[in-house]
Amino acid sequence: MLGKTRYRPIPDIINEISEMETDWVELHADHLTEDRDYALELFKALEPLKIRWAGETTIRIADDPELLEAAARSGAKYLLIGIETPSKAALKRAGKGFVKPENLKSQISNIHAHGIIVDTTAIFGFDEHTPEIFIETAKFYHDIGVDITAPAIAIPFPGSRFYKQLEQEDRLLSDNWGEYDGAHAVYQPKNMSCEELEAGAEEFSQHFYSVSRSASRKLRQIKDFGLATTLQIS
């Protein structure tokens, strides 16, 4: 059990940011808007600082106009959002059934309308995944408007349900913790080989960042964010 989430006093955060010699900061939290009231209070306190910030939250922020607008007013310019996969079955298994692939395009468009860049990781290696998932995900992420992404192979952290499942099924292949980095297949995938999983993650990047898709994405980003911001997007 992770226990209860602890929150820093907002005045402490504001004081620390005020002393920084920068107008761009990362509000580091695994789920910045988990406590909605806290997030609203924080965003209001950030407004006078006139900063730009990056943070991590869930796609639910797209369906909360008050919270999204408050984030934008406070300087939100870049959000890492856990989408992970277009597979509904895999999302449900990961405890993210609230992510509805059919709604993501409009939700991301709503975030873009507030001048906010959307980043998300593409997670591969779910039991529901077959070798077709890599190109499917690249196309899906492009079509729904993801701005930045990188692939990662699912990591079975010790103590997690995923780890226990793989252990029970005798599918763990490595106890070298240095390989538990999202780049190595440390377990036997269900519907492909380890080599296919590792190569597929690279294949995803090649397709998402192909010349044609990158050019199309840049044109859309110029429209959404302007040229200066677009040139800063990797």
Where are these regions (language model features)?
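A generic structural motif
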Residues: 55-58, 149, 153
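Acidic, metal-coordinating catalytic cores used for nucleic-acid/nucleotide bond scission
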Residues: 128, 155
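C-terminal accessory regions of radical SAM enzymes
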Residues: 117, 132-135, 139-147, 158-234
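Proline-aspartate-enriched helix->loop->beta-strand connector
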Residues: 22, 76, 146-147, 154
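Short gly/pro/ser/thr-enriched loop/turn and capping motifs at secondary-structure boundaries
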Residues: 87, 156-158
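Radical SAM [4Fe-4S] cluster-binding motif and immediate context
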Residues: 1-119, 124-126, 132-139
